[in-house]
Amino acid sequence: MDMTLESCRRFVEVLASDAPAPGGGGAAALVGAIGTALGNMVGSLTVGKKKYTDVQDEIIALKAKCDDLQKQLLDQVEADDKGFVPLAKAYGIPKDDPNRDKILEEATVTACAVPMHIMELCCEALDCVAVFAAKGSRLAVSDAGCAAVCCKAALQAASLNVFINTKSLKNREVAEDMNRHANVMLNKYCSVADEIFNEVKAGFGQ
């Protein structure tokens, strides 16, 4: 079942159940899509306004990018579900099966791919949100701050879905390479998100 075609209420109900999916990865993707859409909204409220004529072309281009990022992030909700299936099946293989370790290793690497991609998409989204916050409509600057917070949460949530899988990999070289890539994104873009949030908050005298 493609949960992105369900209502928000239904998604949350299934998320709260004992169903194997959606889980943290799917939730991260959805939160990332929401954060991206919030940034995109700031762009929508900026385009066409005389006060922001000088940045129209830049904002329009960023909106087009966010349209694509939103779609990709929503696609990752279902992709995360499908990526988990082989891993769940692998854990069900009898421990005395000589092929179990190999199958489990491959499934674990596959399970890392989607949350890693979610992280990458959230980083791209935060680059856009930073511009929306700096150059977009001042009437929607709080929404730009909310967008940054959502994208940061999605980034961090997705990272945990990477780390829980890399921890169990036998091939430590592959695991550490993934961990390194994830941590680089976390270190850079959590700071980007915090800077956006703090600047928006400071603008309200807080």
Located regions from the model:
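A structural-propensity feature for long, helix-poor, extended segments
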Residues: 50-89, 185
